[in-house]
A protein has these predicted regions:
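Flexible, compositionally biased loop and terminal segments
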Residues: 1-143
Length: 143
């Protein structure tokens, strides 16, 4: 059943995406889009998966989202990946989330398509994460 669902999704999703793209008014594209990456735990719970799986699934969608923004000429995208409230979560949930963020940002820098900036209260983050984020920013292209 999962294979059938995956196959249908791989066929139908590109058709759906193309239909949406045709309906967009590209003359009204915003210069800057901000997105709060939220709902991954709820998605995981609804799909009987772990929070870590939900956060990983959300992170995998970032590339798709940024690609859509490129296709529609959005110049600046702000992704709110972590709130200070998230930092008060239990370590068993927080640590995997921080690792997923580090991997996601590192992965974005490897594409070489986007200039990365890290904003926010980075002094509240663990040193290892701040280091990884700064390394990713340094590897991203200058634009």
């Amino acid at each position: 059943m999962r294979l059938v669902k995956r196959l249908l999704k791989s066929i139908l999703y590109p058709l759906y995406e193309a239909r949406l793209f045709r309906r967009l008014d590209l003359s009204a594209t915003p210069e800057h889009v901000g997105v709060i990456l939220d709902g991954n735990r709820r998605w995981a719970k609804a799909n009987l998966a772990s929070s870590k799986s939900g956060h990983s699934a959300g992170a995998r969608k970032i590339i798709d989202f940024l690609s859509w923004c490129e296709e529609t000429n959005v110049k600046v995208v702000t992704l709110w990946m972590l709130s200070t409230d998230n930092l008060s979560r239990e370590n068993a949930e927080l640590q995997p989330l921080l690792e997923i963020i580090a991997e996601a940002v590192s992965g974005l820098s490897k594409f070489g398509r986007w200039k990365l900036h890290v904003v926010g209260a980075t002094e509240l983050l663990p040193d290892w994460l701040t280091t990884r984020l700064n390394e990713a920013v340094a590897k991203s292209p200058a634009r």
